[in-house]
């Protein structure tokens, strides 16, 4: 038996007799905030020849990490890799077409924002893209070949064409063999040095906007305009703290009072944004900036998953006339619908978060039509 102890999850591996073939019995354990030991799962499975103990071990913190305070509040971990790509030789990573690859989940609002910026700048030929399977189990984000076409929307999961990884944790271990935190998306991978450059969506979006402009089909698109830099940073922080991460603080809270505080703050923020968007087509008059897409990535998931799954159910986005019209307006921008897959989004949340949804039943609704006329042109 081999036992690996991580910061939040322990795992015990029992090697079975050879007559059973290359199989392993795996027990995944977690120490709760109260100090008690919880068995997350126990299973026996046939080991793949290409799957080493290290690559499995690297997945142990993938699902339901103990990112919570003693009071039951969700506290998100910091991004581990923050290297920078430049086009002026100021960093060790140079902007080059075909060198970097983006690993994402289409369910993740953080990762989806990088996909949107990649699309808006027109750098698809310069930056490759691979989508992980939407269901993140105890082994973490996985690369699996799809057995059929997804009904509508964006590309679905695929195998890894760059490294042949089975799990995204292998990219983390290749970069840092001692990494034992939660494996997250997005990941910007350097095929030349074979390591992760950055796993912070804010950094990746800015690099796509600036450093890769020489390779962009849409060079005039600037999502971080300098003339509103300070105000843009302020509204971005507001959206992140109260909306983007706010729904997670509500959904991942493990006690009533932290949940209620987080949930109420989400709707206080939405009320403020509803008022702001009653006077302006976008957050900054008539131009779309990165903060708009930051907000969009939560709004487009809200009625489908955050309202029910995360219990942010005081109101729906469709109950906010300006936010709903704004959401439809952004969704109808060229190329954006291709980056959104509601089926993928719902399957991830409802099938992955088994502590919240033990049955793993995926709801068939709601019926969402973001293609209707939105009427936001009146605010031009």
Residue ranges and their predicted role:
Residues 4-16, 35-380:
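C-terminal alpha-helical interaction module
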Residues 23:
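Double-stranded RNA-binding/processing signature
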Residues 27-30, 37:
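Short Gly/Ser/Thr- and charged-rich N-terminal loops/segments
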């Amino acid at each position: 038996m081999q036992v690996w102890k991580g910061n939040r999850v322990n795992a015990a591996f029992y090697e079975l007799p050879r007559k059973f073939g290359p199989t392993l019995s795996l027990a995944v354990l977690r120490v709760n905030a109260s100090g008690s030991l919880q068995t997350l799962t126990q299973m026996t499975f046939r080991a793949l020849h290409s799957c080493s103990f290290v690559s499995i071990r690297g997945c142990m913190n993938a699902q339901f990490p103990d990112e919570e305070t003693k009071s039951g509040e969700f506290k998100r971990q910091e991004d581990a890799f923050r290297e920078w790509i430049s086009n002026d030789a100021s960093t060790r990573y140079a902007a080059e077409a075909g060198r970097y690859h983006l690993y994402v989940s289409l369910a993740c609002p953080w990762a989806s924002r990088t996909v949107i910026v990649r699309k808006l700048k027109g750098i698809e030929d310069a930056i490759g893209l691979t989508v992980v399977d939407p269901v993140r189990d105890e082994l973490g984000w996985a690369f699996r070949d799809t057995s059929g076409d997804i009904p509508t929307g964006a590309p679905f999961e695929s195998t890894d064409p760059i490294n042949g990884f089975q799990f995204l944790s292998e990219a983390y271990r290749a970069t840092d063999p001692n990494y034992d935190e939660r494996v997250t998306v997005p990941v910007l991978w350097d095929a030349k040095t074979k390591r992760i450059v950055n796993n912070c969506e804010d950094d990746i979006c800015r690099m796509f906007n600036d450093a890769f402009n020489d390779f962009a089909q849409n060079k005039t698109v600037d999502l971080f305009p300098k003339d509103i830099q300070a105000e843009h940073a302020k509204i971005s922080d507001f959206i992140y703290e109260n909306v983007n991460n706010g729904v997670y603080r509500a959904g991942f809270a493990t006690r009533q009072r932290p949940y209620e505080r987080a949930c109420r703050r989400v709707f206080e923020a939405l009320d403020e944004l509803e008022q702001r968007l009653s006077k302006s087509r976008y957050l900054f008059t008539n131009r779309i900036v990165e903060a708009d897409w930051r907000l969009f990535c939560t709004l487009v998931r809200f009625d489908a998953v955050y309202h029910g799954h995360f219990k942010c159910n005081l109101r729906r986005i469709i109950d906010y006339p300006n936010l709903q019209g704004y959401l439809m307006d952004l969704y109808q921008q060229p190329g954006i619908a291709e980056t959104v897959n509601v089926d993928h989004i719902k399957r991830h949340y409802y099938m992955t978060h088994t502590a919240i949804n033990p049955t793993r039943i995926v709801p068939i609704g709601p019926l969402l039509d973001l293609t209707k006329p939105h009427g936001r042109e009146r605010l031009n």
